Amino acid sequence: MTHPKELPLASLQFYATAPYPCSYLAGRQARSQVATPSHLIHADTYSGLVANGFRRSGMFTYRPYCDGCRACVPLRVPVAGFQPSRSQRRAWKAHQGLQSRVLRLCFVPEHYQLYLRYQAGRHAGGGMDHDSIDQYTQFLLQSRVNSRLVEFREPAPEGQLGTLKMVSILDILNDGLSAVYTFYEPDPDASYGTYNVLWQIEQTRQLKLPHVYLGYWIGESPKMSYKAQFRPNERLVDGVWQPEPRDETVGSPRQG
C-alpha cells in the first residue's frame, strides 16, 4: 500500500480510524485511512487520491487500511479496450430506452423514496434501509469535488417526467469517472446495475477520458465481486495499476 507521504499531496494529513465491523466480510474488522482536511480536497487533488485507491463517501475521502487483510482491491475499467459480455449486451439492450438526465447534486423526495425501496429490497437489515433524510443527504448529496447526479426514467410524453427507475451519483475526474453509488428499483427481472456501469463506460468514452473507477473489488463478497465481470480491467496492487490476471475465472452473480 502506498504511504501517504509518497503521494503528491503534501498539504493533506492522513489518519487511521478505529476498527469497526466490516460491511462486506462477515466476522472481520475493518479500518480506514481518511484524508483531511476535506476543504483542501479539490477536484485535482481528489483525482490523484482516487488514482491511489481512495474513495469518497459524502465529505469523507478514504481507503481501506485493515490489519492483516487486503481483500479490498481498487478496480478500474480502461474504456478503450472494454468488450461487453453477452449478458452485458442483453442488459444494455433491455434498458437502453431509459432516458438519462444529468443534474447537480440536489435533494428530490422521489429520489429519497427510491433509495429507501432499494435499501429495503436489496440490503434489508444492513443498517441503511431506515436512513433519515439527513443521513441520505450526508451520504450522497454532499461533495466538494466535481460530482453529478444522474436520473434514469422510463420514456414519457414531451413535457412530462417518466417513471423513475434509477439514480446514480458519480464524480468527474481528470482521467475518467468514479462511480460513487447507484440505487434503483429493486426489480428481480431487471439489470439496472449492470446497465448503469455500461452507461458510465459509454459516457467516459464520449468525454474522451480513459477510465471508469468502480471502487473496490472483493472476490469473497458477492456484493462486490461482480465488478470483475467488466473486462478488461485493472487492479491497484502494491501501488501499481496492473491488468487483471489472465487465468482468473469470474463468476456471474446476479447484479441487478
From Swiss-Prot:
One of its GO terms (cellular component) is cytoplasm. It is found in: Cytoplasm. It is an enzyme of class 2 (transferase). InterPro entries: Acyl_CoA_acyltransferase, Asp_Glu_LeuTrfase, N-end_Aminoacyl_Trfase, N-end_Aminoacyl_Trfase_C, N-end_Aminoacyl_Trfase_N. Its EC number is 2.3.2.29. Pfam families: ATE_C, ATE_N. One of its GO terms (molecular function) is arginyl-tRNA--protein transferase activity. GO terms for biological process: ubiquitin-dependent protein catabolic process via the N-end rule pathway. It comes from the Bacteria. It catalyses: N-terminal L-glutamyl-[protein] + L-leucyl-tRNA(Leu) = N-terminal L-leucyl-L-glutamyl-[protein] + tRNA(Leu) + H(+); N-terminal L-aspartyl-[protein] + L-leucyl-tRNA(Leu) = N-terminal L-leucyl-L-aspartyl-[protein] + tRNA(Leu) + H(+). Keywords: Acyltransferase, Cytoplasm, Transferase. Belongs to the R-transferase family. Bpt subfamily. HAMAP family: Bpt (MF_00689). NCBIfam families: PRK01305.1-1 (NF002341), PRK01305.1-3 (NF002342), PRK01305.2-3 (NF002346). Functions in the N-end rule pathway of protein degradation where it conjugates Leu from its aminoacyl-tRNA to the N-termini of proteins containing an N-terminal aspartate or glutamate. This is Aspartate/glutamate leucyltransferase. The gene is bpt.
